[in-house]
A protein has these predicted regions:
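N-terminal active-site segment of His-dependent metallophosphoesterases
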Residues: 1-80
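Acidic/histidine-rich helix-loop elements
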Residues: 18-48, 75, 116, 171-191, ...
Length: 471
């Protein structure tokens, strides 16, 4: 394949399609409702959403489409076949399509067929099968492949290279059907040292040849809020800071990601240079967005704008309905997250109790994920829902969110009032305000005021929907 020889490349970026093949839903029932209630995805409409996206992308006439992972609901083979078939329409129109896997896409124990109140396993796929299914979308002889992962490097023009990074840990997924203790799909991202070196070598060579290099990956490389690597670690690739530094040194200054279903642009300033991360929301759930970017390699910049999927052929009010589904899922998502991570939560509580035995004698922490969920929802549901929606929509800094920050802090105070007994209650609240609330406020401000590198001399706000980004 010959590369294009022009300096300007128009591209579309889509992420987190989460397509569910219609045949996986044999009969409606409690099993599928349980799955829907703990999520914000519009799974019934997922194939129609992709069909509509394909039409909209064709209307834009890009030369390149990037898909940053989670192509399927849960790695079902039949879902992958449908996604590849739809994306092939773009390829047939002369558009290059490049994909990378997300944490849902391969070797997934949650691949299920829904039959009324029950489920049965659906066929999932292996890593070689992923490369075979998407062979015309990055995994052919025109790409240079990492021998150990699904990462690859692709020259798009004489001046532009795409570094496609596989950050998934599906090799560690467990299956009861294979003798494991539980079904578990790893959400986190990781890159082995050898793969990191391969990526750095590819980027270094492309930069030395005079090409601009843009990366794509499912997991985040740059935090989208203060302490994301601690508070939402599964959404960031392990060792993100060091990897980011190495990629910047190799000449990479822009990366497209997905995973968290948000429209947000984050930036970090290192001694070696700047890295800008463009996270694209999921069209399959609110805010139902994707991106158009025009790269001018001669000028060394990229112009970016967001696109919104407002309607479907079957639903003219699709985006608004998706927003209501998003809001309604907060309680069940809270229950689901606490239940899923309950072993880790109890381990952290026990460690804290062992270190602060005297204080913890006066603290009544609920002993089940359900009880903790109800406590948090009682005092925090409304402000957390609004904060989450504001974060997902992007451009949070465009409105005054101080009142929302105050509501969140008051909600935490009420949780303390209900869990701390006796004389320690005012002391505990005072300690929280002194030691923890400063950090808590930084986290909230970084989200609700859209601040990058908060608290540093590089603190800045970037327009999440219309931006000019240096390459």
């Amino acid at each position: 394949m010959k590369t294009m020889n022009n300096n300007t490349v128009k591209m579309a970026i889509i992420s987190d399609l989460h397509v569910m093949a219609p045949d996986l839903l044999v009969n409606e029932g409690a099993a599928f409702e349980r799955y829907l209630n703990q999520d914000r995805k519009m799974l019934r409409e997922s194939l129609e959403i992709l069909d509509t996206l394909v039409v909209d992308i064709l209307d834009q006439k890009p030369q390149l489409v990037l898909v940053t992972g989670d192509l399927t609901k849960d790695g079902e083979q039949m879902s992958h076949q449908l996604v590849a078939g739809r994306l092939q329409r773009l390829v047939d129109a002369g558009i290059q399509v490049l994909v990378v896997p997300g944490n849902h896409d391969i070797n997934n124990p949650d691949a299920r067929v829904y039959v009324g109140d029950n489920t049965v396993p659906a066929d999932t796929i292996t890593r070689p099968e992923f490369a075979k299914i998407y062979r015309h979308m990055g995994y052919d002889e025109n790409s240079r492949r990492d021998p150990d992962t699904l990462s690859y490097c692709r020259d798009i023009t004489d001046d532009l290279t795409i570094l496609a990074i596989d950050s998934c840990m599906d090799r560690l997924n467990t299956f009861v059907s294979r003798g494991d203790a539980r079904d578990h799909c790893k959400t986190s991202g990781n890159l082995e040292a050898s793969s990191q070196q391969w990526l750095v070598d590819q980027a270094t060579a492309a930069t030395a040849a005079g090409r601009k290099v843009i990366a794509m990956m499912h997991h985040h490389l740059v935090p989208h809020f203060h302490m994301e690597d601690t508070l939402a670690a599964p959404y960031m690739v392990d060792g993100a800071g060091q990897l980011c530094q190495r990629l910047v040194q190799a000449g990479v200054h822009v990366i497209f990601t997905g995973h968290l279903h948000i429209s947000d642009i984050s930036q970090t300033n290192l001694r070696e240079g700047t890295m800008v991360e463009v996270a694209t929301a999921a069209a399959v759930g609110y805010p139902c967005q994707w991106r158009i970017a025009t790269c001018n390699t001669a000028a060394g910049k990229m112009q970016l704008r967001s696109m919104t999927l407002n309607s479907l052929p079957s639903d003219p009010d699709f985006a608004e309905r998706a927003r209501e589904v998003f809001k309604s899922c907060i309680p069940t998502m809270t229950h689901g997250v606490l239940t899923r991570y309950w072993p880790e939560i109890t381990h952290a509580i026990d460690n804290y109790r062992n270190k602060h035995d005297f204080v913890m004698r006066f603290v009544d922490i609920p002993d089940s994920p359900e009880a903790i969920a109800e406590l948090l929802l009682k005092h925090l549901q409304e402000p957390v829902t609004q904060a989450y929606i504001t974060f997902a929509e992007g451009n949070e800094g465009g409105s005054d969110n101080q009142q929302l920050i105050n509501q969140l802090i008051k909600g935490v105070d009420k949780v303390v009032d209900q869990t701390v007994r006796g004389i320690l209650r005012p002391l505990t609240k005072a300690a929280l305000h002194l030691r923890i609330y400063g950090t808590f406020k930084l986290v909230l401000r970084s989200i609700l005021e859209d601040l990058n590198d908060i608290g540093t001399s590089h603190e800045t706000v970037i327009n999440d929907h219309t931006a000019i980004i240096p390459l």
